[in-house]
């Protein structure tokens, strides 16, 4: 249906159909992220020997995150007197919009994908980098030293880990022969790339955690050093924009790892009768659990250690993996 609409002449009907689909995607993702945050808090509570949210919405705290969202929407929207007002207002939008744009190319099943484009992997990596511009803009516009330091840290971290992230997936592109995410999943029908590209998987996972600014790489928001980092001066719904973009990317990156390394919706051998959507959900949940486990387990590292590890360790390993993959493909495939 979508392909037919894309090839048909432009009309107001097409506009309203795509606008409706975009709104549907927005609310579906926001609803999922809302309860995804609750799930993370519950898992962290379990790992730390706590109960977690249990006051709003019954003993399981099912409405806790909904209450948090309502609280943020009702809080006063304050803008510092010394801030650059236009940029201060624009920054959360710049950070927030790309987070939803990247989800359009993720194939959740062979039949459920919003946009099947030939360069889906390249599109995801390119668009996700725009968020850093919003983060740096927010830090600059706040006219606060802690916010500015947080924004500068975010930019330095993104530059340092974007390169290993891209290099780690070149091996997959060589093996699959495509940048299309659907074709990459189809190429893993017999064997998942986590077994063929274990080094690439480890490099991608570490670089992804750094890209997401999550522990142990959460230097842009380091509460013990920078109050709250680049969004120190933000409150209410503007702060919620930054928070939601972080969590949408969190779940988006988990989906991308599932597609690139875990075979997407492809089933385990002899269990093909289970629907592909179930397999995708199970793999996705495992990646999310692993990333939450990282957050609970590891302490924050120093800035110099972060930079040194990215440039001196991850990048050479990623380059060596490309060379080795090309050699194996040339000799055996």
From Swiss-Prot:
Point out the coiled-coil segments of this chain: none
Give the record's GO CC terms.
plasma membrane
Q: Does the keyword ATP-binding apply?
A: no
Q: Which GO terms describe its molecular function?
A: NADH dehydrogenase activity; oxidoreductase activity, acting on NAD(P)H, quinone or similar compound as acceptor; quinone binding
Q: What is its EC number?
A: 7.1.1.-
Topology within the bilayer: Multi-pass membrane protein
The membrane spanning regions, by residue number, are 15-35, 88-108, 117-137, 159-179, 191-211, 239-259, 274-296, 313-333
What the entry lists under Pfam families is as follows: NADHdh
Which keywords fit this entry according to its UniProt record? Cell membrane, Membrane, NAD, Quinone, Translocase, Transmembrane, Transmembrane helix, Ubiquinone
Is the keyword Ribonucleoprotein in the record? no
The enzyme class is: translocase
Locations listed in the record: Cell membrane
One GO BP on record is: aerobic respiration
Q: Which domain of life is it from?
A: Bacteria
Q: Catalytic activity annotated for this protein?
A: a quinone + NADH + 5 H(+)(in) = a quinol + NAD(+) + 4 H(+)(out)
**What does this gene product do?**
NDH-1 shuttles electrons from NADH, via FMN and iron-sulfur (Fe-S) centers, to quinones in the respiratory chain. The immediate electron acceptor for the enzyme in this species is believed to be ubiquinone. Couples the redox reaction to proton translocation (for every two electrons transferred, four hydrogen ions are translocated across the cytoplasmic membrane), and thus conserves the redox energy in a proton gradient. This subunit may bind ubiquinone.
Q: Which NCBIfam families match?
A: PRK06076.1-2
How it assembles, according to the record, is: NDH-1 is composed of 14 different subunits. Subunits NuoA, H, J, K, L, M, N constitute the membrane sector of the complex.
Q: Which family does it belong to?
A: Belongs to the complex I subunit 1 family.
Instruction: Output this protein's name.
Output: NADH-quinone oxidoreductase subunit H
The species is Bacillus thuringiensis subsp. konkukian (strain 97-27)
The root-end lineage is: Bacteria, Bacillati, Bacillota, Bacilli, Bacillales
């Amino acid at each position: 249906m979508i392909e037919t609409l894309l090839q048909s002449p432009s009309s107001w009907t097409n506009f309203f159909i795509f606008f409706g689909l975009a709104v549907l995607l927005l609310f579906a993702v926001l609803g999922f992220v809302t309860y995804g945050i609750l799930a993370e808090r519950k898992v962290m509570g379990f790992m730390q020997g706590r109960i977690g949210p249990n006051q709003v919405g019954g003993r399981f705290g099912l409405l806790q995150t909904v209450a948090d969202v309502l609280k943020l929407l009702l809080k006063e929207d304050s803008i510092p007197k010394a801030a650059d007002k236009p940029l201060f207002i624009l920054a959360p939008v710049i950070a927030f919009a790309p987070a939803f744009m990247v989800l359009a190319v993720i194939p959740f099943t062979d039949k459920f994908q919003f946009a099947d484009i030939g360069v889906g992997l390249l599109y995801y990596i390119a668009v996700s980098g725009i968020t850093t511009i919003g983060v740096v803009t927010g830090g600059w516009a706040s006219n606060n030293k802690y916010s500015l330091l947080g924004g500068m840290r975010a930019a330095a971290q993104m530059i340092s880990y974007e390169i290993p992230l891209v290099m780690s997936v070149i091996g997959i592109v060589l093996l699959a022969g495509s940048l299309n995410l659907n074709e990459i999943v189809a190429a893993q029908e017999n064997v998942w790339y986590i077994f063929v590209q274990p080094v690439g998987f480890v490099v991608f996972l570490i670089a992804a955690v750094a890209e997401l600014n999550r522990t142990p790489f959460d230097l842009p928001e380091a509460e013990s050093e920078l109050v709250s980092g680049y969004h120190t001066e933000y409150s209410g719904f503007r702060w919620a924009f930054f928070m939601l973009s972080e969590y949408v990317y969190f779940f988006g990156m988990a989906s991308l790892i599932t597609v690139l390394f875990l075979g997407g919706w492809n089933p385990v051998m002899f269990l093909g009768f289970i629907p592909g959507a179930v397999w995708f959900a199970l793999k996705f949940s495992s990646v999310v659990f692993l990333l939450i486990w990282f957050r609970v387990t590891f302490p924050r590292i120093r800035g110099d250690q972060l930079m040194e590890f990215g440039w001196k360790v991850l990048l050479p390993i990623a380059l060596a993996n490309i060379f080795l993959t090309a050699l194996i493909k040339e000799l055996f495939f």
